[in-house]
């Protein structure tokens, strides 16, 4: 943004440098080049699915060819049923196929298309994207109502939580695993997740766009119009996951509620109803805004990984989401809070995976 003060340019440069410094060429089981989450620890020298989608969306702005290859690297290991596995390494024996990750890949592909107008890449990816999109409804919709659940191929809750990307989120504390019909490797948590279905709604919208570009017919399921009302608790004024057994809301207010705003699934009235919670300094408008769970929650832990700290991707979803609904002044204020208050962000410190919400 040209209206930002020059002191914030360093943050933008740091973000680009962070991506470039984590760039790794193809080697061994990594058949295409891409970005690793961190070169500082050996166990992070691999490619993770939802990291790849976000890295590629960012790379699209300055190195779209690298962005394409990073996506191709994950699809090199697409399973026969369409699944994209969690993570891949130079040694394929280390790959994790117990779970997938949240589906943001069509968003990444669309970002690449926005900056390149490369219809050939859309044509290359479309069949694979459709196979992955359909996989969610084939293997992760326990009661076949069009609302999906996170799950695993081995029936473990551990891998199912990994599939959400939010490994130890409070909303999963009481979750149980259910075997899905039709395949031995299809298991779901006993709760439908709002973020997953909001992501799928965006994937659906973009896949329809790609189909239009290619002149083909979109033949996937479409439940996108149902997501907002299904997951919105009118009494609490917030989005929550829902239990499969009785449809009740899992009223653990967390960052998954930002996703319907970012994906533009929420209605304007729903976003307005959320504002009291989002702007409450005891809940989500913390010193560093938009934690992974409301800061006054009894289980909130400032060092609890997905049980308290802010993660920059989720904070971005919240701020971008507010902007999507016209709350530009509020979004600007929260953006500056992030830039000004994260220790070392404007100075020489590295960008961290997550941060505490308070001073």
Spans of model-derived segments:
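Extended, well-ordered alpha-helical scaffold segments
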Residues: 7-14, 63-76, 119-137, 203, ...
